[in-house]
């Protein structure tokens, strides 16, 4: 730990200072004895005379023995103190492993170590919670994916079984059942494709084939392509796109980002409402997509882009979405040096996209 060295230095300083003071006191004793001995005339009948005479004749030996005892005593004392600190730290480490939920408390001399160990404990608890949440989201995704795979697959099997077992069906009904089975199979293909794509983005580094792209033109083309879908829900575009906004991006992947965002906005918009798309270039390139829909709770906003998080636990498939479009969009934007965020209030949903300006700008 980074706080061990100051504690060791402190103990060593105390050890040497204490030893030095005691040795200085020891050296002064012979001087005091000599001073006392010289203050008067002593007689052999006085008991203290023999003591003074003993120290006067053997003062060097006495000082050496005293110095040895001082060194031995202070060394034992501070070694015991250091071992006590070590044992206290070992016990705290054991507690950190066996009882991570319990706060660590050490003696006042180890307050810095205590704070650092408690910080490690908190981080470990946070990591454990995050790992459990991630594992739970993965388990939920498997359940949801199995449900979403089974639903269209069941429909495909059902309609194909009808076609096989009902030879008397009219051509019109056969065509209708075939068309429905094809639509369900296409949804199944889309779901599997997006699931593998988000998994690939999470496990590998996204490789970008960058080029200079006119975002203004790209967004205009995308909005035109979505007109049939907008007409189905009586939605309409409100565009505020700055002209000639260039960006160095992977054109195909960035188009995928805006395709996902627009589909999401269409799926979750109220009928007969506008979709506002804005493009502005300032210090960075900013794209904002606004639609009218059910307000997203604040606690769910930050988790919209998590691959294994679902806001709607019921997993209604009325929108025909896979639920993986937003995580894919964020992965692409982060790899492109940009970012994405969302906000929602008063039945309005806003997605904000930021991209870096080209280096030559």
UniProtKB/Swiss-Prot annotation:
The chain crosses the membrane at residues 16-36, 59-79. CDD domains: HisKA. Mg(2+) binds at residue 252. It catalyses: ATP + protein L-histidine = ADP + protein N-phospho-L-histidine. GO terms for biological process: cellular response to phosphate starvation. It is found in: Membrane. Pfam families: HATPase_c (PF02518), HisKA (PF00512). The keyword tRNA processing does not apply. InterPro entries: 2-comp_sensor_kinase, HATPase_C_sf, His_kinase_dom, HisK_dim/P_dom, HisK_dim/P_sf, Sig_transdc_His_kin-like_C. It is a multi-pass membrane protein. Residues 144-359 form the Histidine kinase domain. Keywords: Antibiotic resistance, ATP-binding, Cell wall biogenesis/degradation, Kinase, Membrane, Metal-binding, Nucleotide-binding, Phosphoprotein, Transferase, Transmembrane, Transmembrane helix, Two-component regulatory system. The modification Phosphohistidine is found at residue 147. It comes from the Bacteria. Induction: Expression regulated by upstream promoter elements. Part of the probable VanC-type operon associated with vancomycin resistance. Its EC number is 2.7.13.3. Autophosphorylated. One of its GO terms (molecular function) is phosphorelay sensor kinase activity. GO terms for cellular component: plasma membrane. PANTHER family: PHOSPHATE REGULON SENSOR PROTEIN PHOR. NCBIfam families: HK_VanS_ACDEFG. This is Sensor protein VanSC.
